[in-house]
C-alpha cells in the first residue's frame, strides 16, 4: 500500500516510477479520491463541532431564560443528529474508495531496476557452474519418475484432478530430504528461525502481503458460506427478472435497492473466510502485523517448510505435464523484517542464502534481475534464480526455482507493522521474502541433472545423510 501523503506531496515523482511498470499515470485520480475523503471528514467534524457548541449554548440560553433561543438550538441539535450519520457514512465510503484504489496498485520499482515490458527485459546478473554433459539424451523428470514407478500422476488425478502428483518410495524420501536439507542450512548456518505456521489464513493476512484483493482468483478459498452465496447469486442472475418482480411486489424495498444489497452481500469481506496459503510468506510476514518492534531486534529472519497451494488460474495450457506447475507443492520460504536502512543489504544476503543450498546440490543456475514489467505486485526489486533442467524442452532449459524480493514498506503499511528506533518514533518496517528454495522444483532439478543412462537417479552428496543409506534411486 502506498502513502497517500507522499503521493500528494510529489505526484510527478510517483507517476514517473509508477509508469515504469507500463501502467498509466494514476496520481491525479488518487489525489481526487483523497480530496473527497478530506472534504467528507471536514464536513463531519464541522457538524460534530457545531453540535457540541449548540448543546453548550442550550444550557447558556436556558440559564439566561431565553426560551426561544433554547428551542431554536434544540431544533438545530435534533437536525444535526439526523444528518450526522449520513456524514459519517460519507467519510466511511470515501475512505473505503481511497483504500480500495491504493490496495489495487502495485509497488514502485527501485531506480536501479532495469526497464522492460516482460521477461524478455530481464537481465542476467550471474551464473554458477555449467550444464552437465551426458553420453545419452536426458529425459524429463516425469518420464524418469513414471518409469521408476515412483511418480504417479494418474492416481493423483483420480483423487484430486489435474496438476497433482503422488510420490512414492525413494522419490518421496528424496523430496523430504531436500526440504530438510534446506531448513538445516538456513537455520543452522544462515541465522533463520524456523517457524511452523498455519496453512489457513484469514482475509486480513492475505491482504497484508498483497495476495488480496487483486489476485483472489489465483488462490484456493475455504469457505462453504461464501460458496453458497456465490451459487445463490448466480441463480439470482439466471432468474433476475422474476426475482426483481417478486421483490417489488413484496414491497420490501425498490428492486434496484434490493439488487444492490445482494451484490454487496455477495462480495463483502468475510472475517470467517479462510484461504490456503500460496506461500509461507503470508504466514511468516503476518507474524509482525499490528505490532511495534524494537529495532534492536531487527533484522528478524524467519523460515518455514510448508505445503503451498495455488489455483494457477492464468496457467491454462502451460506446463501441463510433470511437476513444474502444481496446485500443491512444497517450499522453504525465507522472510526478513528489517529497518529501511538494512533492507537493500538484506536482499543481497537473502539471495546468497538461496544460492548456497543450490550450490551444495551441485546444480547449475543463473541469477536474473527482473525488469519492471516482470516484477511481482508487491516487489520493489526481485532476483530470480533459474536452475538448469536438462530434460526440459529441446536440449534443456532454465526454470525459476527461487524469487527473492524486497518490498520496502509496501506490505508493512497494509499490515500496520512498525518498529521503534533510537528516537522513539514508530516507523514502518521493510519486508523481504524469498524461496529458499522451491522443494518440488529442486526435486525436478536433482532428478534431471543426476539421471543416469539406465534411468536411475544418483543422490547428491549433500543429501546422503538424509537418505538412510540410499545412494541411487532405481526401479526396485
Swiss-Prot record:
Residues the record lists as binding L-serine: 279-281, 333, 435
InterPro entries for the chain: aa-tRNA-synt_IIb, aa-tRNA-synth_II, aa-tRNA-synth_II/BPL/LPL, Ser-tRNA-ligase_type_1, Ser-tRNA-synth_1_N, SerRS_1_N_sf, SerRS_core, tRNA-bd_arm
GO BP, sorted A to Z: selenocysteine biosynthetic process; seryl-tRNA aminoacylation
Compartments, record wording: Cytoplasm
Reactions catalysed: tRNA(Ser) + L-serine + ATP = L-seryl-tRNA(Ser) + AMP + diphosphate + H(+); tRNA(Sec) + L-serine + ATP = L-seryl-tRNA(Sec) + AMP + diphosphate + H(+)
Involved pathway(s): Aminoacyl-tRNA biosynthesis; selenocysteinyl-tRNA(Sec) biosynthesis; L-seryl-tRNA(Sec) from L-serine and tRNA(Sec): step 1/1
Enzyme Commission numbers on file: 6.1.1.11
Domain notes: Consists of two distinct domains, a catalytic core and a N-terminal extension that is involved in tRNA binding.
Record text on subunit structure and interactions: Homodimer. The tRNA molecule binds across the dimer.
Protein's name in the database: Serine--tRNA ligase
Amino acid at each position: 500500500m502506498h502513502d497517500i501523503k507522499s503521493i500528494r506531496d510529489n505526484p510527478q515523482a510517483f507517476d514517473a516510477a509508477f509508469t515504469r511498470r507500463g501502467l498509466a499515470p494514476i496520481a491525479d485520480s488518487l489525489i481526487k479520491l483523497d480530496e473527497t475523503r478530506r472534504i467528507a471528514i471536514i464536513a463531519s467534524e464541522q457538524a460534530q463541532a457545531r453540535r457540541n457548541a449548540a448543546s453548550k449554548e442550550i444550557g447558556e440560553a436556558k440559564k439566561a431564560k431565553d426560551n426561544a433561543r433554547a428551542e431554536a438550538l434544540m431544533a438545530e441539535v435534533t437536525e444535526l443528529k439526523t444528518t450526522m450519520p449520513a456524514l459519517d457514512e460519507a467519510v466511511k465510503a470515501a475512505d473505503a474508495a481511497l483504500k480500495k484504489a491504493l490496495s489495487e496498485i502495485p509497488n514502485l520499482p527501485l531506480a536501479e531496476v532495469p526497464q522492460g515490458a516482460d521477461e524478455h527485459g530481464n537481465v542476467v546478473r550471474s551464473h554458477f557452474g555449467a550444464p552437465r554433459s551426458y553420453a545419452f539424451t536426458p529425459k524429463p523428470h516425469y518420464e524418469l519418475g513414471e518409469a521408476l514407478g515412483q511418480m504417479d500422476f494418474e492416481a493423483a488425478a483420480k483423487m484430486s484432478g489435474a496438476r497433482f502428483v503422488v510420490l512414492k518410495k525413494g522419490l518421496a524420501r528424496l523430496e523430504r530430504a531436500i526440504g530438510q536439507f534446506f531448513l538445516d542450512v538456513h537455520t543452522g548456518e544462515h541465522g533463520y528461525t524456523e517457524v511452523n505456521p498455519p496453512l489457513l489464513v484469514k482475509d486480513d493476512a492475505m491482504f497484508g502481503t498483497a495476495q488480496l484483493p487483486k489476485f483472489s482468483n489465483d488462490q484456493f478459498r475455504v469457505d462453504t458460506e461464501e460458496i453458497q452465496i456465490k451459487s445463490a447469486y448466480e441463480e439470482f442472475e439466471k432468474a433476475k427478472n422474476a426475482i426483481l418482480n417478486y421483490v417489488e411486489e413484496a414491497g420490501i424495498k425498490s428492486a434496484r435497492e434490493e439488487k444492490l444489497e445482494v451484490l454487496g452481500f455477495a462480495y463483502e469481506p468475510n472475517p470467517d473466510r479462510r484461504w490456503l496459503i500460496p506461500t509461507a510468506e503470508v504466514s511468516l510476514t503476518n507474524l509482525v502485523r499490528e505490532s511495534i518492534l524494537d529495532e534492536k531486534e531487527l533484522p528478524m529472519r524467519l523460515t518455514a517448510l510448508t505445503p503451498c497451494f495455488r489455483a494457477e488460474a492464468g496457467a491454462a495450457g502451460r506446463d501441463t505435464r510433470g511437476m513444474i506447475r502444481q496446485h500443491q507443492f512444497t517450499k522453504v520460504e525465507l522472510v526478513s523484517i528489517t529497518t529501511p536502512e538494512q533492507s537493500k543489504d538484506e536482499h543481497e544476503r537473502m539471495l546468497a542464502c538461496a544460492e548456497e543450498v543450490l550450490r551444495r546440490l551441485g546444480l547449475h543456475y543463473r541469477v536474473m534481475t527482473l525488469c519492471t514489467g516482470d516484477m511481482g505486485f508487491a516487489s520493489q526489486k526481485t532476483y530470480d534464480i533459474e536452475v538448469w533442467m536438462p530434460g526440459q524442452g529441446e536440449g534443456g532449459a532454465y526454470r525459476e526455482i527461487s524469487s527473492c524480493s524486497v518490498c520496502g514498506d509496501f506490505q508493512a503499511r497494509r499490515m500496520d507493522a512498525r518498529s521503534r528506533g533510537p528516537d522513539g518514533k514508530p516507523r514502518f518496517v521493510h519486508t523481504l521474502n524469498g524461496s529458499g528454495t522451491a522443494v518440488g522444483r529442486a526435486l525436478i532439478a536433482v532428478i534431471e541433472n543426476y539421471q543416469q543412462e539406465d534411468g536411475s537417479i544418483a543422490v547428491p552428496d549433500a543429501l546422503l545423510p538424509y537418505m538412510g543409506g540410499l545412494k541411487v534411486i532405481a526401479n526396485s
